[in-house]
């Protein structure tokens, strides 16, 4: 269950922002859009679409974390599939696992998840090969790899395709205090590394470390 009725974020509107200043005059390098916000309401769906269009028009790179949530999509599949597909077609960086790509974008692929980390890696690679054919504008695809041992012990890794090169941070054990925010930390670290013009293998390493820090920091 997810009750967000009355949340101020549901009313986000591009009319409240100076998009010309943000994208044209100040030249934002990357804008990150979340599938959670995109699916939050009809207003936020349009908000993210308009941001993506404005960013593309002005040469700003677009990062999109699909972040599928069944409670947000209930009864809205057609509307959200159309919006997510357009945003993904404009995006340079796509973040999500097999389930996200299947349910948000309708890309057929292997069964989400897998029995172990190695199978998850192979499933993700196969999915991205298919996604690239549908969304050729994107050049970076990434996701985290998580295997829960127990509530406080996880194996945490990450995988990324940049251009034609795969980069993997092999899962290692981390002591988790609160798993919430690990994915956001990962994306934040990934984007930071890209903005710093580090070599691609460091993008995924810094994203991994940022996500690990977010879940283990007291």
Regions found by a protein language model. Give the residues of each.
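Conserved N-terminal subdomain of the carbohydrate kinase-like
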Residues: 1-38
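Conserved post-catalytic alpha-helical subdomain immediately downstream of the catalytic base
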Residues: 167-218
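A generic structural signal for short hydrophobic patches within well-formed alpha-helices
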Residues: 17, 38, 69, 101-102
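A short helix->loop->beta-strand "cap" motif at the edges of active sites that frequently abuts
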Residues: 56-61, 135-139
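Charged helix-capping and loop-helix junction motifs
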Residues: 17, 45-50, 76-85
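Conserved phosphate/ATP/ADP-binding segment of small-molecule kinases
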Residues: 71-164
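Hydrophobic beta-strand scaffold residues
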Residues: 62-64, 95
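Anion (oxyanion) recognition and catalysis
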Residues: 49, 53-57, 88, 208
């Amino acid at each position: 269950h997810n009750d967000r009725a009355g949340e101020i974020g549901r009313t986000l509107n591009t009319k409240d922002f100076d998009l010309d200043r943000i994208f044209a005059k100040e030249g934002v390098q990357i804008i990150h859009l979340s599938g959670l916000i995109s699916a939050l309401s009809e207003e936020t769906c349009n908000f993210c679409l308009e941001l993506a269009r404005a960013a593309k028009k002005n040469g700003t790179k677009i990062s999109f974390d699909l972040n599928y949530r069944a409670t947000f999509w209930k009864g809205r599949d057609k509307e959200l599939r159309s919006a997510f597909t357009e945003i993904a077609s404009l995006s340079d960086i796509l973040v999500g696992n097999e389930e996200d790509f299947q349910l948000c974008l309708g890309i057929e692929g292997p069964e989400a998840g897998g029995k172990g980390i190695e199978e998850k890696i192979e499933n993700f690679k196969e999915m991205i090969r298919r996604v690239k054919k549908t969304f050729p504008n994107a050049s970076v695809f990434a996701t985290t790899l998580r295997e829960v041992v127990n509530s406080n012990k996880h194996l945490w890794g990450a995988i990324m395709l940049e251009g034609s090169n795969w980069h993997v941070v092999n899962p290692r054990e981390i002591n988790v205090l609160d798993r919430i925010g690990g994915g956001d930390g990962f994306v934040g670290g990934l984007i930071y590394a890209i903005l710093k013009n580090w070599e691609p293998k460091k993008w995924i390493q810094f994203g991994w470390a940022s996500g690990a820090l977010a879940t283990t920091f007291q």
